């Protein structure tokens, strides 16, 4: 639970950050919030319909739940650090750099979810073979693996750098807890890919 980490010092640190530091911290937080919001619904919607192993179903449900906690954690940071949290939230989807970075993840999820649901309901999708549907599943899995193993960690490094400077340490602590979870998600996605 993110509430277990105090952000009092972060509120004070925020006031002392230079404008470019505030920009980096905020842009990074917006990116993390958007991608974890996507991940908060992605694994269950995309992968669960194709899962037949009870232990893997439980794993995917847990993964999905953990991602929703991460999204709440970013919300907790934003609400406790910024005097006007709505300004941060409102700009998440209007920042073209953030949405462009997230597009490859959302695109592969959307393709799999849309075609997969039609396939499951109708048993067919016009012009889509079983092989192509499997290819879309594979692409989504690989994309999620890259998200969990590379993209999140690039953004985490930024948060950790603030912590190393003894700035925004509460936020860095919360991010370190999220990073711990993401390493588990990375292991899960790699296991699925290796055994697919």
PLM segments and residue spans:
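Non-heme di-metal
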Residues: 1-196
């Amino acid at each position: 639970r993110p509430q277990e980490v105090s952000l009092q010092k972060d509120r004070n640190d925020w006031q002392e950050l230079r404008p470019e530091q505030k920009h980096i911290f905020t842009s990074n937080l917006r990116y993390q919030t958007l991608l974890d919001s996507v991940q908060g619904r992605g694994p269950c919607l995309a992968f669960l319909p194709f899962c037949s192993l009870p232990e893997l179903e439980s794993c995917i449900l847990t993964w999905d739940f953990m991602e929703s906690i991460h999204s709440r954690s970013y919300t907790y940071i934003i609400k406790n650090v910024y005097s006007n949290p709505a300004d941060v939230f409102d700009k998440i989807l209007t920042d073209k750099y953030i949405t462009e970075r997230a597009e490859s993840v959302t695109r592969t999820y959307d393709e799999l979810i849309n075609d997969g649901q039609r396939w499951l309901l109708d048993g067919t999708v016009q012009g889509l073979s079983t092989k192509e549907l499997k290819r879309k599943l594979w692409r989504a899995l690989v994309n999620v693996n890259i998200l969990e193993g590379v993209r999140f960690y690039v953004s985490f490094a930024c948060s950790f750098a603030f912590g190393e400077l003894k700035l925004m340490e509460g936020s860095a602590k919360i991010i370190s807890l999220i990073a711990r979870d993401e390493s588990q998600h990375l292991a899960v996605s790699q296991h699925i890919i290796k055994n697919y």
